[in-house]
Amino acid sequence: MADETKKTEAPAQQTSNLPATYASGLFSMGQAELLTFVVPLWAVLQGAEPAEIGILVGARSALTFFLAIHGGALMDRLGTRRVMLFFTAMTGLVAAAYPFLPWLPLMIVLQMLIGFASNMTWIGAQTMIALVTGGDAGRIGTFSFYSRIGTIFAPLLMGVLWDVAGPQISFLGITAWSSCMFFAVTRIENPQKADAVIGKVSWRDLLPKLSDYTGSLKLAVLPAVAFTLAISFTRHATNAAESSFLIVYLKELGYTGTLIGSLFSFAAIFNGLGSLGVRFLRGLSTAWLMIGFTASSILLLALTPLFGSMFFLLAASHSIRRLSEGIVQPLMFALQARAVPREVQGSIVGLRVTNNRLASIVTPVIMGYAVQWFGLANGFYVIGALLLAICAWLAISVAKFELDRI
């Protein structure tokens, strides 16, 4: 693995692009949190059943699952900045349409469109930081920290908007947030060489190509890539379970939108601190760090019903969970960025996001039916047991195949 890393080492960091790239991470992650917060509550207002909420949340990942690899390849081919600008504008426009289309089938369509567009902006931000830093874990940790600033303020903003102005204005808040991201991306100078991207774009350049998919899938044979894909799947399955029913569960306990938003914002601070703290973990096994902190994140989510009625314990548990996630993310990004050549950074991010979207599609549906069959509190226990079993399998694999050396 060390040989692979040396072989694909990137050129010097482009520090002039760092501030705007950090800002793109902030707004793209915050954008996702705004959608995570408002859509389940909007669905409850429309009278959706638990299984329907799970399907609605899962639909947000459907197009991304099929087209993330294509989107990453587009960034390699057309330029990351250009693709990010288009999908940032698309996210803002689709968000503004939600209040006018409150029927479940149309909401599913909107979820598919806005899920794809917002995920493409996040793919772009991840690709951009990999290009700008060359896979430096310290600077990627700083990028993750700034990304978490978006997750600190976005839920709080949405909670206040929901309580004070109502759901319609809340969706327009997403549009305003996307406008801020659009401006941030315009400040980034394209880090890709002019001869490495297509100048004039034709409609054929926009179509998915089989070679993009096969080329990306071949990257999964690299041990570093395969392991991080497995960790990323488990991590995103945990977040998908949280996105589906944690907010609904807290609302049922009587918490206001502002209080729920404050809980998420407070926990996001610890997520950012975890990302900044990665630089102090150098020399320790990356594989075991990822497994240990991913498992702790799953366990704390599964135990939510034990803390639900005690807000301060719930806040502490959720904050430690986010701290664990904050440590895992930059380790994962940096390991993958160093494992593949510079010219396919978009493709590797697209592959990782496809993997993540699979988790985001499957988990809400499974948890939706678990909640419907066993009750809301027991649903957390069921999904936690399943995800911890995956972590146990990963730990056995690391020990058996000595993957702790990657």
Regions found by a protein language model. Give the residues of each.
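Cytoplasmic helix-loop-helix junction between adjacent transmembrane helices
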Residues: 112-148
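Juxtamembrane intracellular "pre-TM" segments in multi-pass secondary transporters
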Residues: 2-15, 190-228
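Helix-loop boundary and gating motifs at the non-cytosolic
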Residues: 11-61, 224-253, 257-263
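Helix-to-loop junctions at the C-terminal end of transmembrane segments
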Residues: 67-79, 162, 274-286, 371
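Structural signature of the two symmetry-related core transmembrane helices
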Residues: 82-96, 175, 288-303
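Residue-level signature of mid-helix packing/kink "hotspots" within the transmembrane helices
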Residues: 61-69, 151-152, 268-276, 360-361
